């Protein structure tokens, strides 16, 4: 249904990289989610009222909170689509992440309240009144939530929306929660054993779990996280396709919201190359990154010696030392500066964040190996952390 609506109401609906199309998908899915959740709330609330079931009533109000979540997501997409201004030169894209976080908080609050009321129901149980109509409503709810989880996950992945992925997780947890309520309903109707309150606790725990998972997924891009490996590979392929670029390092992808990405990196170029030609190459690369990946790029040129035999030999030697210590280690910006009494060997090493050995121990190990072979060489080592894995 959502696919059909997208074809009818979203112009150029296949072009999901276009910010306008992406925003339209978010708004469409938000409206559909509001409608579905209001229908489910109404039917479940009536079913819970007539059956005196706390689990069904709680599940109904969970759907009402889902409708509120869909409204927040819809508003978030609208606000995130605003153009950059003087106060927010990088746009408003991160509002989408904030809306996803608000949805997560609502999910957690609803789960807490449900567990609280269900525990009370365990100690003060009431005999529920079930009927085939009640069971039919629950089955209908499970099918609807399954569909909502599928379309939110599919479109969320397609347009790269953490808010919609959070909604998909919420819908999936709702489906599982309603299934638990249905099982409890059937067991109570068949055996006379009242497990309504216990089912409510299970539903509440599912909701709490889904809320924390969704919060984690929305907080990560707000705090900053590594870029997708596919994007890193695309950047590498584009930059290294130019003959004047020997290598790249210090790649950082700054995410200011979906479709608002800034790339900064260091491009290694021949130290003896023509500066005008090299600068022209860098400009061309920045333009290609912007055109192909829709990312603004800032590239710093790092001159690298490609003709000095001593530098190349020592670089290969140090690279071998790093491989002996751990293949996960790498280096860049390698150069040597000769003086009257000693020679400085200057380079940066890249160490993963979760590396079990301290930075100082790694540097000491490298320095010891170099000075064993070259006693008059001093090392000047800077440590970089592997932002991009």
Annotated model-derived regions:
Residues 1-240:
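Alpha-helical transmembrane cores and adjacent cytosolic helix/loop segments
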Residues 1-26, 217-389:
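Peripheral (non-transmembrane) domains and long loops of multi-pass membrane proteins
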């Amino acid at each position: 249904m959502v696919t059909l609506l997208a074809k009818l109401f979203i112009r150029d609906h296949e072009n999901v990289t276009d910010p306008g199309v992406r925003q339209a998908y978010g708004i469409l899915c938000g409206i559909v989610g509001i409608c579905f959740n209001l229908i489910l709330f109404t039917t479940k609330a009536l079913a819970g009222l007539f059956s005196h079931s706390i689990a069904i009533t709680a599940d109904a109000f969970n759907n009402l909170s889902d409708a509120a979540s869909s409204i927040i997501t819809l508003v978030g997409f609208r606000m995130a689509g605003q153009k950059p201004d003087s106060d927010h030169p990088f746009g408003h894209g991160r509002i989408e992440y904030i809306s996803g976080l608000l949805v997560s908080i609502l999910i957690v609050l609803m789960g807490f309240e449900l567990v609280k009321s269900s525990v009370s129901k365990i100690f003060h149980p009431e005999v529920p009144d079930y009927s085939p109509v009640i069971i039919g409503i629950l089955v209908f709810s499970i099918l609807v939530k399954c569909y909502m989880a599928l379309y939110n996950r599919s479109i969320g992945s397609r347009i790269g929306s953490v808010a919609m992925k959070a909604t998909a997780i919420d819908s999936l947890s709702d489906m599982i929660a309603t299934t638990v309520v249905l099982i409890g309903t059937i067991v109570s109707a068949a055996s006379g054993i009242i497990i309504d309150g216990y089912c409510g606790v299970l539903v509440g725990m599912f909701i709490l779990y889904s809320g924390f998972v969704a919060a984690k997924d929305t907080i990560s891009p707000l705090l900053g996280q590594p870029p997708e490996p596919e994007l890193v590979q695309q950047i590498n392929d584009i930059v290294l396709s130019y003959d004047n670029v020997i290598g790249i390092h210090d790649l950082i992808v700054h995410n200011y919201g979906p479709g608002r990405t800034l790339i900064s990196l260091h491009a290694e170029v021949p130290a003896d190359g023509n500066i005008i030609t090299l600068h022209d190459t860098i400009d061309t690369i920045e333009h290609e990154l912007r055109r192909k990946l829709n990312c603004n790029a800032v590239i710093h040129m790092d001159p690298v010696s490609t003709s000095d035999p001593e530098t190349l030999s020592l670089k290969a030697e140090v690279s071998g030392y790093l491989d002996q210590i751990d293949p996960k280690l790498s280096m860049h910006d390698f150069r040597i500066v000769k003086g009257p009494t000693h020679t400085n060997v200057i380079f940066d090493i890249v160490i993963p964040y979760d590396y079990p050995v301290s930075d100082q121990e790694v540097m000491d190990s490298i320095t010891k190996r170099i000075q064993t072979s070259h006693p008059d060489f001093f090392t000047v080592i800077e440590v970089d952390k592997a932002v991009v894995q």
